[in-house]
Amino acid sequence: MLRACQLSGVTAAAQSCLCGKFVLRPLRPCRRYSTSGSSGLTTGKIAGAGLLFVGGGIGGTILYAKWDSHFRESVEKTIPYSDKLFEMVLGPAAYNVPLPKKSIQSGPLKISSVSEVMKESKQPASQLQKQKGDTPASATAPTEAAQIISAAGDTLSVPAPAVQPEESLKTDHPEIGEGKPTPALSEEASSSSIRERPPEEVAARLAQQEKQEQVKIESLAKSLEDALRQTASVTLQAIAAQNAAVQAVNAHSNILKAAMDNSEIAGEKKSAQWRTVEGALKERRKAVDEAADALLKAKEELEKMKSVIENAKKKEVAGAKPHITAAEGKLHNMIVDLDNVVKKVQAAQSEAKVVSQYHELVVQARDDFKRELDSITPEVLPGWKGMSVSDLADKLSTDDLNSLIAHAHRRIDQLNRELAEQKATEKQHITLALEKQKLEEKRAFDSAVAKALEHHRSEIQAEQDRKIEEVRDAMENEMRTQLRRQAAAHTDHLRDVLRVQEQELKSEFEQNLSEKLSEQELQFRRLSQEQVDNFTLDINTAYARLRGIEQAVQSHAVAEEEARKAHQLWLSVEALKYSMKTSSAETPTIPLGSAVEAIKANCSDNEFTQALTAAIPPESLTRGVYSEETLRARFYAVQKLARRVAMIDETRNSLYQYFLSYLQSLLLFPPQQLKPPPELCPEDINTFKLLSYASYCIEHGDLELAAKFVNQLKGESRRVAQDWLKEARMTLETKQIVEILTAYASAVGIGTTQVQPE
């Protein structure tokens, strides 16, 4: 508030000093008591004070204009030649160029096309800033609003107005200076008209563009999804084939180890075992071949998927980045899974290769040993060769055995020497092998690290792309919000201008029209007013009579209808009462369904009656209720049984307790009837007193109070009286509903009889 007051004061001072409206008036003619010297001194003081005030106002205006650019704009628009004063003192305004003044015309508004708006909106912010800095201010000032509004063209559904002077696009004129619009430009800008597109057209174009982009995004997402589905299917098949190959290689290795370990098995079993090994080898080769084929297919599909993703990136469809990022993540996961399975297959094949080499060495050693035996014992029968030593122990002679033992000693010595040499040689081989293994492991480790780094880099790149996309979306939303606000402000300004112009034109037209029509209207009113008054009076009189007749007839018909319904309801309720009271020894209860249906049929449009009839217990409708006489007769039997089991609580005590309770009922003689007190004490709440109170109430016709006393019973006495209490409750509920219906029917009947005389 203080700032507004200061602003208004400074503005007024600036207007007074710059426009020349502040006039120093001479003082009133004073009396001639003062000398001429004092008069000159007073005039000088006034002039000095005026100059000081004017200078202070100008200085304050300049200082405030330097601090607030909006105030400078308003002063430059309001006070002529103030812009030159500000430019001399403060310099040119930064990013603040006054729009050329032009008269508001009633012609259509001009607006830049959607294609121009979209082209300008797609420029990056850096280019826009560069264009703003390089282009002269007089050329960028008219198009600045169009650039601001065009950037929000994707989301706005309102027209994007913009002023497009013809000469504003010609930036090659050297006469146009920064911050100074030339007079020719101002005249041409003032003569150019403003055209505004209809909001429906702009909204339709934007909706069509959004629809096309959405269709492109959907088609791209569908193609990526189909390619991912196909690649995932082939990759899963390849992974399954690799797992099957691992299982086949491991099975063959296990069977081969078992065959080599069990060397003491008989011939037929051994041959069967080796046939099993051959079958496992065939299965292994088949599984490995299938795994290799599946791996090649999977690699081809992965390469195809990579090409599909690259093509999707090259299309540069707006909004498709999340789909591409998700597809890249899934592709990366498939590649990692496939690499892991391939590593498992390679490890299994390495282990199987070691087992195969071990088997070849064992077979070679056995063959060498057989050849040595053949050379040592040539006289041994051919049929004995190949048999075990235990089988040949009884068939060989002493010389043969001695020669075999001597050969065995020589062979052992030879093998010991070879073993020592082999140990020395193998130490060197092991050292070389360890170094070679270290190099191989280092290379494998380097390759694994490189591959892991590549996977990690791809994951980091995907995460970075996702974060960049999120930040870009947030910044675009913020930019669109700001641009939408500026566009809305510009649109509101144009709307206000058009509203003012419309009001001026409308007031002028209405004034002329009112002047021309006032005379004819007054004359026509004089002639028609009398006829209208007479006709209105006659119509009102006739209408009042007609309304009175209609109201009387309607009230009489309504009263008769209500009286008829009340009478029918009363008759139906009386029939229901009769059904409740009618009973015999053969039929103690009569179903009340027919009587209740009659009440519902007679009062089908009465919600109160329908609610009461719906509250009647269903068992009363189907079976009926016992009358009070029947309940009184049943009560005495229930009372007798309840007194017999008065000592039994809810836990149903032992048979001895039952006997004591029965004995108590025989020995005690409580009064059959006791008048219930106004308030029950804790001493009154026992089975005998409660039954005496209930008997008194039943004898005096108060079934409801008797049911309340019976409801206070506990233990076995309450269980004995449960059926009687249920029937009494049903009878009381039905009786209460019938009484309410009777009272309602009587009230409605009385109301209709009071309405009839009217």
Curated annotation (Swiss-Prot):
It is a single-pass membrane protein. Component of the MICOS complex, a large protein complex of the mitochondrial inner membrane that plays crucial roles in the maintenance of crista junctions, inner membrane architecture, and formation of contact sites to the outer membrane. Plays an important role in the maintenance of the MICOS complex stability and the mitochondrial cristae morphology. The modification Phosphoserine is found at S103, S112, S113, S223, S388, S390. Disulfide bonds: none annotated. The chain crosses the membrane at residues 46-64. The gene is IMMT. The lineage of its organism: Eukaryota, Metazoa, Chordata, Craniata, Vertebrata. InterPro entries: MIC60 (IPR019133). Keywords: Acetylation, Host-virus interaction, Membrane, Mitochondrion, Mitochondrion inner membrane, Phosphoprotein, Transit peptide, Transmembrane, Transmembrane helix. One of its GO terms (cellular component) is mitochondrial intermembrane space. It comes from Homo sapiens (Human). This is MICOS complex subunit MIC60. It is found in: Mitochondrion inner membrane; Mitochondrion. Belongs to the MICOS complex subunit Mic60 family.
